[in-house]
C-alpha cells in the first residue's frame, strides 16, 4: 500500500526529471531566439503553440487535457520571454535605478537591475547570459577592458554605457551622448559658442564633453579633484555660461550636498545635473533660486535609454512616450506650506484619509519627540531653539519623505529647509486671507500682517501651485486633488 510519503517521494523524483528537462528546453529556446532575432522572425508563433498542445493532449482525459494546457501555457509564456532575451542595467553595489521602469514602458518586460562589484565586472560580462544591458557608475570606463568590440563613438568618448551581445561577442556603445544632446534641447539650454564647465572626469563626463563638441560649444573646462583644473582653480571656470554636473555629489533624497557653490559663477545661463534623484538636487535648487534655467538628468536617462532600446534590436519608442515618462517618473509627493492657521494640517489629513496616503506634520512630529506642545517649547526655550529642532526634523524627513508633509508656517525661513522642502516633492502653498487665519495656539502669530508680508515672497518662490483656502475647505481639497491628478 502506498503511503503519502511514498507517493510524495515519487513526485519529487519526477519533479527532478521535469526540472532538468525544462532547463534543457530553455537552452534550446534561447538558441531559437537568437536565430529568430538574426533572421527577423517574430517571437510569438501561435500556430506552433497550438500544434504542440494538440499533440500532447490527443490521448488524454478532459481533466488531463486541461492540466496540460494550463502548464504549457505557462511554459510557452516563459519560452517567449527567453526567446526575447534578458536585459538590464549594471551598476555598483548601491545601484538604484529608474531604468527598469523606463525600458518596461518601452515594451521590454525582461529588463532588470544588477549590482556588480568592480572586481567581478569581467566575470559578469562573460557569464551573465544577458542579450544586452546598460552600464552606469562606476563601470562605464572599466567595462571597456571586458568587451570584445567597442563602437567608434564609444572608443572616441572613452566610455561605454550600452552593451549588446551579437553572436556571443560583447560589443560596447555609448548612447549618453545622444541622450544628453536631446535633453539640453528639451530643456532649452544652448551651448553653441558658450563656455561650458563640466564637473567630473568619469565616463559620463567623457560622453558629455564629446556631445558638447558636436554641439559646437566654445571653451570646455573639465573640473575634477585631481585633473589639470581642480575645484580650487575657480578663476579657470567662474566665467562659464553653462554648468554640467557629472559627479555623484548630491545623489539621494535629502542629500543636500553640492559639488560646487553656485555663487562662484557670475555669468551662468544654464545648469544641467546628470543626477535625477532627488529632483531638484541642491545644485539645481540653488541655481533656480538665482533665476537660472536648471534641470536634473531624468530626461537624459529616458532618451539615452530609447537609443539603447533600439540597439537591443527593438523599435525606437514613439517620442510621445518621452514626455509621459518624464511626467510619470517625477515625484508625486506633496508638501503643504502656508501661514499658521491657513488649514494645512486639516487639508493634509483629508488628503491622507481620502487616498490612503502616508502623512507627517512637522509640528506634530516635534511635539511627539519633545513631549511638549509647540507654544510651550517656544515659551520655555525660545524661537531659535524651536527652529533648530524644526530644521533637524525637516532634514530627517527629507531622507525618506512620506506621501504628504505639512509644514509649520515659518519652516520656509531657513535656506537649507527650502532645499529639503523642494526635494521632498511638489510644494503647495495654502493661501488664506490674514483676517481669516485661525490664531489659537500660535505664539508666533502676534503680528500676522508683518509675518505675511515677510513670508509671502518666499512662499511664492517655493510653490509649484497656490491653493486658495478662503472658501469652504472642500473647495481647497478639490483643487489639491485636481493638482495631484495632473501629475
Language-model segment annotations:
Residues 87-187, 278, 284-286, 290-293, ...:
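Phosphate/diphosphate ligand-binding glycine-rich loop within oxidoreductases
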Residues 229-295, 411-417:
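Rossmann-like adenosine-cofactor binding region
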Residues 361-412, 416-422:
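ATP-dependent small-molecule kinase phosphotransfer cores
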Residues 274-332, 469:
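Adenosine-phosphate binding glycine-rich loop
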Residues 91-93, 172-177, 184-185, 193-213, ...:
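Glycine-rich adenosine-cofactor-binding loop
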Residues 1-86:
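Domain-level signature for soluble enzymes in the chorismate/prephenate branch of the shikimate pathway
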Residues 423-458, 462-465:
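A glycine- and Lys/Arg-enriched "phosphate-lid" helix/loop adjacent to the NTP-binding pocket
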Residues 322-327, 334, 350, 354, ...:
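NTP-dependent small-molecule kinase module
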